[in-house]
Amino acid sequence: MNMDSGITSSHGSMDKTQKQSSEWAANQKHNQRVENTRVLMGPAVPAMPPVPSNFPPVPTGTIMSPQLSPFPDHRLRHHPLAHMMPADKNFLAYNMESFKSRVTKACDYCRKRKIRCTEIEPISGKCRNCIKYNKDCTFHFHEELKRRREEALNNKGNGKSVKKPRLDKENKFKDENFDIAVRSRNTSSTDSSPKLHTNLSQEYIGVSAGKSASDKEDTWPDFVPIDRTVLEKIELNHTKVAGKVFVLEEICKNMKGTIEKLAEKSKIDVIDKEYMKRPKRKQYSKALLTKQKMFHFRQNVLSHLTDEEFLSPINEMFTTTFKYSILQTKLVLDFSFRSASSPSSDNILYPLPRLAIAKRLLKNIKCPSLASLLHIVDVDQCLQFADVHFDPAKGRLTSSQAFLLNICLCLGATVTNFEEKQELVDEDNHETYYFEKFELWRLRSFTFLNSVYYYHKLSVARADMTALKALLLLAKFAQQKISASSAVKVLSVAIKVALDLRLNLHSTYEDLELDEIIKRRRLWCYCFSTDKFFSVVLSRPPFLKEENTDVLTDESYVELFRDKILPNLSIKYDDSKLEGVKDIVSVVNLLANHLEYVPYIQSYFLSRLSLIESQIYYSCFSIRTTLDDTLDEIIENVLENQKALDRMRDDLPTILSLENYKENMRILSLDSSKLDFEVSCCTTILLHLRWYHQKITLSLFVISIIGDNLDQRESSRHDIAEIIRRSRLDFKRNCIEVLNILKDFEYYPTVQNEFLYFSLTTVFSMFLYLSEIMVNDEHAMETGYIIGLLRDTHTRMLGSEERCLSVHNLKWQTSLFFYTFFLRSTMEKFNLTSKYAKFYAFDSNYYEGVLNRLVKHTRESKDDMVELLKTSFINKEKMAAFGSFVTEDQEKMEVSFNIFNEITIQDLNFLQFSSIPKLWENKTLEPGEEYHHSNGTNTDNNETTGADDTDDNNNNNNNNNKNGNNSSSTINNNNNNYSNSNNNDNDNNINDDDDDDDDDDDDDDDDDDDDDNDDDYSNNGADDDEEDDDYDRSLFPTGLASLLDASYPERTANDYRDENEQSNKLFEKIEGHLEHGVFFYDRDFFFKNVCVKM
């Protein structure tokens, strides 16, 4: 029964199919364009009959071929792919509309209007467009085309040459090559496919002729027929490509479902990133010498010393620098209050030196010490301001101009060497002048205070380019002489001014002259790079992001260099050569042959390095690094940043390469001054030191974060052991290269401020590395080699005859002190334990004397500040009433010092001559006795001075900070316990992060909150960080030398807690005397207010 029904059904289906085929053939004949097919080349290929199919016929409408699309608007013509569609694959017909195939030829009207022609209607004999617009549907174009083709064929048969257009040659060449490539991949399909060329041949000829006829309708162009074989190949290739495109389209549509099915069958779990394990919650910082690291250094290198022998020199240096910091801050605070409240302007500003001295100081700015600032300072402009200031007949300076003049005089006094003679040029005579040390000190301080006054006055003044220059110079001076925490406030104002001037937008520079464009762009580049530098130093988010500006892109620099600078060079380049240069590297190489434009190239690479530094901060040191990213993602970010740094160095032109920059610059500077050569060398070295600093930082960071998350090593897709091994080698190699640079670099009196931070990162990292490998004598040769490099670098930094030892810069003296302390300690350890000690013969006793001389010079600098404060802020009559400043009783007396009250003579005398008592004498008070004694003394002092309850609240804050978790001081530099971090931004390496602005930057309005809010802030901060206080936030990883494969032990929370307790115990005596013995103030509250006022 089933068999009979099946046979019957099959016969019925075949009858329907045959009937459908006959009807389809009749319909094809009826719709054929008889009068137009004669224009085609050769006989037309008959349409293929439909393939039998099991699909039911269309119930209504025109009878169609089963291979054609069922859509009603599809043209009734045979598709080229009909022969390739088997009966069981009729679903392909439903997507044939996507091919959008055209009619073989268009009528004259549609061709003229350039609209799509349609099939000829059988009834009217016209296309739809001709019917719609009531036009004659003619094909004169195709008739003329056929005539010309037949004429060309006759000429070819008679042996006459036929000149083919170039276009036909190119098309033939391309088509033949394409056909060869397709044939090699589809040989079987090519052989089995019939040569269907009619439709495509018609379309190709029509389109080609149509393009030439569209220009001139009445004049027909010469047409050369295309070989039949070529047309067949073109049509065949078209068929193959069309089929493949359709198949790919279908595959892409079903790709998502296919992947999901494969995942289900193979039981692959697709893990959402949100649920993946994160690294241990920890915010990494750039600090190197935290209390924990000092404790490790003592345990590994100086275990033979007692606590007194180890801490005595550190205690003495810290005491002096700490007092200096208070004095310098007091100087700025008192003047700020005075300038805001004084009714008379006569008592606000300090007088400037006479005109000849002022001009000498301004000219001294042109020196390598200020290499990075010379493009900001226009000395000629400042000299004009000086003439106007000293000659009222020439006018009066604006606030911005006076601001710039004072800060430039301040910088000039800073770089002037009092030991060298100075030529003073006056109107009538030349004078040889020698500055006194204290005279330069006074000039620098007075002009700085004048600059602070104009800085506060900017809030009501109009900002302009002059004010922007002055703000940038003030920020640089504050960073070098006071602290980065104070300087960052000035920098934020400078950035606001730059944004108001729209220096961040490329459109601002369109209508300016070339000189003005270069000046403004370099100012903006300096703002951007300085912001990134402070972000590195303070471990805080930068103010500016990449999306804030479109001036520092490669395209913008290419436009500036290629279109505006290169055409103005003395050596003219061909326009064709300039047009062919489109990448920044090629443009830079052309421009690098001119020394006068080297600063612009350095500016470009500095901005490029700044962008990489910004990425490093967000991917490594942001507070959300361990919250948002997995360990693998963090490692990938580190590797990407390392590649970006390597690409930048590879793109440096030869003149800026580290290997031969001096020789190249010397050749290019034959026609330039010696100063230009020295400045170019300094800026090149600074660029490389900054680059090496980032490479070293990334190496230390990746080792640290892997060491903190060894439990995720097995699940990582990276080769963790290889990454650690390579990072260690990169760290050591880069540090050695930096030391080789430093020991051969020619130092200048104050050029240390420019590269001190980057240099000290390398120096202190190497000392910590030595403390790791000196536990045993396995690496004795390597240890001796590195100590020798550190010794040579130290000798170069001291200068000939130790002339740089007495540089009047407390930051430099403090940094050099710790350098000397570590070098002496390492040499002592090597001499005691290494078998190669006699071979190297390091003299550690020499550095004991250097330490003593450094402490002496630091104390003298502090005493000079006391004298300046006396002459600046104490009324002369009041001073005379006191008589002698110093008495023996005052020198020994303990004084409670509140920095927010009016300073007295006794306070100054105490700060000048008193020192912290010896910590290990028998008479030293116990912590409890000292606390009560100092608390009572502070209370008495508050009653006599009329202090408000702020002091009591501050004392409570001190108690909270001391009794709480001390390790939190590694985040906030305020609680630094063994060096003057508050005065040294470069001592971010020497101490805990100078990061006290992190909260201030986010919310400036909270800086002036009452003390109750400050109490809450301190307590809440302690509670929030309670679980994280037991880890060391130093950038240098513990166990760097022993971090080999799986042998590195994972450290538990108890290990961190024990280490923290031991390090706190080592330094608690210094903390006790600072917080409750001699000085009384809340350091958190104090430095927040310092930042507000600055």
From Swiss-Prot:
Topological category with respect to the lipid bilayer: Single-pass membrane protein
Region (Disordered): 1-33, 927-1035
Pfam families (alphabetical): Fungal_trans, Zn_clus
The protein, known as: Uncharacterized transcriptional regulatory protein TBS1
Bias (Acidic residues): 990-1031
GO molecular-function terms, A-Z: DNA-binding transcription factor activity, RNA polymerase II-specific; sequence-specific DNA binding; zinc ion binding
One biological process term in Gene Ontology: positive regulation of transcription by RNA polymerase II
